[in-house]
């Protein structure tokens, strides 16, 4: 990178950080931190543990924002120092270091700016993402498994913890359904736009004649809510609870004990299933928690079409309902039909590179 270009990039980052400082309002932020620290120092602070924990979480969030800003300012000063050295003497190693630091800092600022768009009541929560095979038979079940890998890879790349909480194997290949719990701040905010139908076009590996096949899978995304958030009372008469033997490959517990639990909320038809815990009781508790989260979100929306809008799998995973097309043949292209965002890097997308689509959706909304 030429020194003039480096200095121009540094000026642009300095301008971005100036806007960041204005947005944060550091004097007010520091005043809030002092107020919360005084509250936390009171002798009766832990008398109400729920309130105390929320206060500490708020305090930690504010401190993290301040520390993050100062860290970025430190990185900016380092870049300025490197630029001064490069003006005096060319150094390939220093130049590479400057480019790497610029890329990293720009990426962190992009991420921070994107998070400012996540202002929904549950956007900062973790996410529960469910995949259901739609129209397309065996190909659709294989497609559902490919999406399972894609979202798992995305979560891991973001530094989130990803847990598989339910899976139903396909008849010949792939999966009929699966549920991922993605732990981490803003996971729901980032993933909420993924709900809907995802369409795949490719040469079917399951067709002896090598014909092109179109397959569909439905994605549902819900926030992972804490116990204190789940203040939803569900009458027993509104629940239908069934148990089955855990499906899957291997394991001493598979197909021997009925540990899998399926819970249906009869008034709405919402169904959840959990298979991954070792006991029936644990699976029942997890399934009920997820059901409560879904009902709570629907109540928050207070719209007649709330279920259809919040639950991606309520729209039939079939032709005409897709939010995104993944074309492997006769050309390679992934295109979001809502934002017209597209890329030819099909392999990258299937390996979890979804930020292009996530960011364009958030900005469009």
UniProtKB/Swiss-Prot annotation:
InterPro entries: PCRF, Pep_chain_release_fac_I, Pep_chain_release_fac_I_sf, PrfB. Peptide chain release factor 2 directs the termination of translation in response to the peptide chain termination codons UGA and UAA. It comes from the Bacteria. Belongs to the prokaryotic/mitochondrial release factor family. This is Peptide chain release factor 2. Methylated by PrmC. Methylation increases the termination efficiency of RF2. The modification N5-methylglutamine is found at residue 252. The gene is prfB.
């Amino acid at each position: 990178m030429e020194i003039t270009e480096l200095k121009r990039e540094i000026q642009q980052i300095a301008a971005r950080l100036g806007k960041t400082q204005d947005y944060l309002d550091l004097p007010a932020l520091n005043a809030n931190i002092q107020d919360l620290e005084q509250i936390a120092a009171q002798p009766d602070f832990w008398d109400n543990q729920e309130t105390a924990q929320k206060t500490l979480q708020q305090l930690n969030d504010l401190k993290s924002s301040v520390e993050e800003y100062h860290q970025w300012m430190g990185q900016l000063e380092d870049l300025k120092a490197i630029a001064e050295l490069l003006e005096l003497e060319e150094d390939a190693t220093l130049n590479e270091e400057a480019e790497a630091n610029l890329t990293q800092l720009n990426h962190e600022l992009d991420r921070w700016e994107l998070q400012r768009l996540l202002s929904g009541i549950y956007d900062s929560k973790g996410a529960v993402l469910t995949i259901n095979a739609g129209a397309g038979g065996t190909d659709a079940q294989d497609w559902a498994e490919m999406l399972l890998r894609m979202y798992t890879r995305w979560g891991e790349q973001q530094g989130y913890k990803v847990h598989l909480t339910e899976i139903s194997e396909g008849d010949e290949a792939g999966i009929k359904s699966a549920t991922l719990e993605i732990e981490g701040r803003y996971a729901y905010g980032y993933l909420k736009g993924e709900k809907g139908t995802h369409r795949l076009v490719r040469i079917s590996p399951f067709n002896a004649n090598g014909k092109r096949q179109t397959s569909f899978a439905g994605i549902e995304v819900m926030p992972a809510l804490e116990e204190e958030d789940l203040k939803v009372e569900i009458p027993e008469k509104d629940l239908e609870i069934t148990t089955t033997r855990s499906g899957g490959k291997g394991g001493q517990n598979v197909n021997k004990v009925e540990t899998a639990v399926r819970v249906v909320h009869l008034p709405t038809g919402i169904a959840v299933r959990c298979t991954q815990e070792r006991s029936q009781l644990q699976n029942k508790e997890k399934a009920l928690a997820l059901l409560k989260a879904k009902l709570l979100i629907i109540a928050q929306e207070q719209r007649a079409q709330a279920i259809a809008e919040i639950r991606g799998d309520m729209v039939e995973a079939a032709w005409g309902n897709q939010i995104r097309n993944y074309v492997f043949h006769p050309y390679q292209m992934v295109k979001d039909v809502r934002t017209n965002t597209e890329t030819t890097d099909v392999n990258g997308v299937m390996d979890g590179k979804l930020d292009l689509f996530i960011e364009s959706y958030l900005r469009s909304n």
